[in-house]
Amino acid sequence: MSAVLRSLPSHAPRTAEGVLAEVNALVGQLRARAPETERLRRMHPDNLRDLTEAGVFRLAMPTDVGGYQAGEDIVAEVLAQISRGCPSTGWMCTIMVVANVIPALLADEAADEIYATPDLRTTATIAPTGQAVPVDGAYRVTGQWTWNTAGVHSNWFAPACVVPGEEDWGLRLTLMPTAEVEHQDNWRAAGMAGTATNIAMVNDVFVPSARTILVNDLADGRYPARRYSGVPYFSRPFVMYINAGSAPALLGMARGAMDCFMQTLPTRGAITYTGWSKAAEAPLLHHQLAKAQYHLEAAEMFTSRLSALYRGVLHTPATIMERAQARAYIGHIASLSRACVNQLFEASSASHTLLAADIQRYFRDINVLHQHAAIQPNSGDEVYGRVLAGLEPNSEIV
C-alpha cells in the first residue's frame, strides 16, 4: 500500500469542519462565477481549484488515504452550500464526492491503485448502456453513456455494464481511468447547463475483475473481504448513499434562490398595474414568501432526516424499508425544493427572467434536476408505496 497517499495535502483543512468553513466562505464567489460556468458548460477552473484545495473531494474518502471520512451531516452541509452558490458546480461535486467512496468498496488492490491518484475525482453512472465481456480475470468494456456529469473533470470513471452470461446477477459496475474514455462535447441544456453532462464513450477497455462490483451488491451492501471490511462507514449500502448524498444539492438550490429573493426585495419598487408602490408591503407577496419558507424548512428537515437515516445503518444492516425511504426522500426533497424556488420565482418581477438575474438560474436548474431519473419523485413514491404495501421494490436504485 506504499503508493497510497496517507496524509492530507499541506494546503488542505485539517478537519471536515474546516472544509465546511472554507466552502461557506466561497458561496459568494461560486455565485459570481455561475454565469461563466454556464457559458463554459463545465466547472469554472477557479471553482475546481478552490474546491480541490478546500478538500471537498476528500470528504468521504478513507482517512488512511488522506480523506476525512466525514459524518453525513457535514457532507450534506458542504454539498448544499456549494449548490447554494452555483447549482451546476454543486451537482458536479455531489457526483464526485459520492463516487470517491466506490474504491473503498472494492478489493484492496483496486482501492490502492485508485486512491493513489492525486486529487482523486471519480464519476459514475448506473445506466447500463455498455457491455463488459468476460476475459481471463477481467472484462473488456465497450459502450456509450449519455449522462456522464463532470466526466471531463474526473480521473476515474465508473460506468455500469451488462455482462453476457451474468444476466441473472444483474449489472456490473466497472472502474477505468478517464484517460481511456472519450467525451463528446454535447451538453447543451436549459438548466444545469454547467455540469458537463456529456456522452462518455469507451471502446474495448481492459478492466481487471478487482475493479468491478455487481450493482446488486452495491445496493445490498455486500462487499469483498478487504481492508475496510471492519469499518462501518464503508459497510453500508452504497446505493442508499447515492440517495442520501444527492439530496443536499437540491436543498442548496432552494437556499440560493431564497438568498437572491431576499437580497433584491428591499430595493423592489411597485408591483406593476397594482396599487402597491413597494413590493415588500404587498400582502400577496407576504403569503408567497411564507409558503416558500415553509417549503425550504421542510426540505431542510427531510434532508436532516435522510442523513440520520443513513447514519442509523452504521452498525445495523439497512432494512428494505429504510432503503425505500431513502429512495423516496430524495424525491420529496426535490419536490419541496422546487416548490420553494418556483414560489419565489413567481413572486419575483418580470425583470428577474433576464439572464442577469441570479434567481432565474435556480429556477431553471431545480426544474431540470427534478427530472433526473434517480430523483424524479413519482418513481421514489412508487417504490416506497410498494414496500409499505408489503411488495418488493421494482427499482435497482434502492
Task: For each feature predicted by the language model, list its residue ranges.
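Glycine-rich flavin
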Residues: 43-53, 57-154
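C-terminal helix-coil-helix/basic helical segment that borders enzyme active sites and/or dimer interfaces
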Residues: 31, 35-38, 297-332, 342-353
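Glycine-rich phosphate/cofactor-binding loops in nucleotide/flavin-utilizing enzymes
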Residues: 348-398
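Short, structured patches in soluble enzyme cores that scaffold and shape functional sites
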Residues: 134, 145, 160-163, 175-178, ...
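DPxDG-like acidic metal-binding loop motif
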Residues: 144-187, 196
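Glycine-rich beta->alpha junctions and the first turn(s) of the following alpha-helix
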Residues: 191, 197-296
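Generic structural signal for well-ordered, non-transmembrane alpha-helical segments
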Residues: 21-24, 252-255, 290-297, 331-338, ...
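Basic/polar N-terminal segments that are highly enriched at the extreme N-terminus
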Residues: 1-21, 25, 397-398
